Regions:
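Short alpha-helical transmembrane segments in multi-pass integral membrane proteins
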Residues: 1-15, 69-136, 182-239, 295-360, ...
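N-terminal transmembrane alpha-helices
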Residues: 3-31, 35-36, 52-64, 68, ...
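Transmembrane helical elements of multi-pass membrane transporters/channels
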Residues: 10-29, 130, 164, 197-201, ...
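Residue-level hotspots within pore-lining transmembrane alpha-helices
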Residues: 17, 21, 25, 54, ...
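Helix-terminus/linker motif at the lipid-water interface of multi-pass membrane proteins
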Residues: 20, 24-42, 111-118, 174-185, ...
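Small-residue-rich hydrophobic transmembrane alpha-helices
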Residues: 41-105, 138-157, 256, 267-333, ...
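Short runs within selected transmembrane alpha-helices of multi-pass transporters and secretion channels
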Residues: 62, 131-150, 157-168, 190-205, ...
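Structural signal for membrane-spanning alpha-helices in multi-pass inner-membrane proteins
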Residues: 103, 146, 172, 176, ...
Length: 445
């Protein structure tokens, strides 16, 4: 096995294992809530959709800073790696506080944006208030996990995630259904379990970054210092990624808004379909993270030919992995949907939707690895932002809104419209990749 393969596997396998278990446990959690009926599914799904905006925005912070972490990792500059993390955490926590305020103080208004069903809103309010506290925990955990993966310590976040996910699943089982001495709390129990699992994850990461045994060590004192020159350089490339992920997540939330306004049934279909579809993306996280680390570190070392060679290999690997994943999602979707307590119409609609999204997996994953893993690694963050925002907001969102709300077409037709933007992205994205404009060193600018 050559050095490239060893590096890919050392990064991709732990992340893939983490994603497999995460998707599996999230499915179990979803099924537990699903056994309470379609209204709790809709309520939890809508709150989680708002949390999704924060998650993707935090991913934007992590991904934007990861461009520099990867290139600094190439030359083993740990001081600047830690400096990058400490500065991006300031941005992340500012955003987290804003999301906390909305979820805790204005849950009814937030849910009312998506749904007019009073029962859905009523069920979702206590869930939103409890999970609001996780915003202050997960942002830190997310940044540290991403940084550890970027310095090729992917096993650490895998183990931490397994502890947190296991904690969450057991907590859900005990508190949703009231097992043994625990009270039966339903959706509120799910929220408490989520909060406790995120707290456990946060505390583990705090221990890791304050311990001398691990490669990334953060200082509380340095967290309150600010290097304006360094920050400007970081945000020059990171800010387009943050804006990109925020607007992309807002676009995905707009899709959910359209489905919710179509009917409660439509939002239940979207929630279940998304949970199943996530199984298809179990390889994506590993491949895209490995792409960022390996291509980015070679750019940091100014090994441009090697970076280009590795980028091409990652695209080839993505096509193979995505084809297998898409087929697997289609084949096993019937087994998964049978675990849900839903009627025949929802069941059949979800199965049709899964065929659509499964067939689209190769093109979606290819776009993801190219944009997130390759173009951003070389600082092409403004182009990536333009490509994603234009394709989503000028193609995807208008199509979904018109077909779903104006013409009131079937759910499956509206779902097809969510895929159309990917065609536009792959044409322009691959053209940019072939131009080689992404091949540049950022840390020595």
């Amino acid at each position: 096995m050559n050095n490239f393969s060893k590096r890919v596997l050392s990064i991709a396998i732990p992340i893939t294992i983490q994603n497999i278990i995460s998707s599996g446990l999230n499915l179990v959690d979803n099924i537990m809530i699903g056994n309470l009926g379609p209204l709790p599914i809709a309520s939890v799904g809508l709150v989680n959709q708002f949390m999704f905006i924060l998650t993707l925005t935090t991913f934007g912070c992590a991904s934007g800073s990861g461009i520099f972490v990867a290139q600094y990792w190439g030359v083993k500059d740990f001081d600047n790696i830690e400096k990058t993390i400490e500065h991006i955490l300031k941005v992340t926590y500012t955003l987290s506080i804003l999301f906390f305020i909305v979820l805790f103080f204005f849950p009814e208004q937030m849910l009312g944006v998506f749904s007019k069903d009073p029962e859905v809103i009523s069920i979702g309010i206590p869930y939103a208030r409890i999970v609001s506290f996780t915003t202050l925990l997960t942002s830190f955990s997310f940044i540290i996990a991403m940084a550890l993966r970027t310095v090729e310590k992917a096993k650490i976040p895998m183990y931490v995630s397994l502890v947190a996910l296991g904690f969450n699943t057991v907590g859900n089982y005990l508190l949703i259904f009231g097992i043994g001495p625990f009270p039966k709390l339903g959706v509120t129990g799910a929220a408490i379990a989520t909060l406790l699992s995120r707290l456990a994850e946060f505390l583990i990461y705090v221990f890791l970054v304050t311990s001398k045994k691990y490669p990334i060590r953060l200082s509380l004192k340095r967290m309150f210092t600010f290097d304006i020159v360094f920050f400007k350089k970081l945000m020059k490339y990171a800010s387009p990624v943050i804006v990109n992920e925020f607007l992309w997540s807002l676009g995905m939330t707009t899709y959910t808004f359209v489905f919710a306004r179509m009917s409660t049934t439509a939002v239940v279909v979207r929630n279940i379909s998304s949970t199943i579809e996530n199984f298809g993306f179990i390889f994506f996280g590993g491949i895209s993270s490995a792409t960022v680390v390996i291509v980015g570190s070679e750019l940091g070392r100014k090994k441009y030919d090697l970076a280009k060679k590795y980028a091409r290999k990652f695209l080839q690997l993505t096509i193979i992995a995505a084809s297998i994943a898409g087929l697997g999602v289609i084949l096993f979707s019937r087994v998964i949907i049978n675990l849900y307590n839903v009627d025949e119409f929802i069941r059949n609609t979800v199965l049709t939707v899964i065929i659509i999204v499964g067939a689209a997996q190769p093109i979606k994953m290819l776009n993801g690895v190219n944009i997130v893993g390759i173009l951003r690694s070389g600082g092409e963050t403004k182009f990536a932002m333009f490509l994603e925002i234009v394709s989503l907001w000028f193609i995807g969102v208008p199509l979904v809104a018109i077909t779903g709300l104006v013409f009131k077409l079937p759910i499956t037709v509206v779902y097809v419209c969510t895929i159309v933007e990917e065609i536009f992205k792959i044409i322009l994205g691959m053209k940019r990749y072939r131009s080689g404009k992404w091949i540049k060193n950022l840390i020595n600018e």
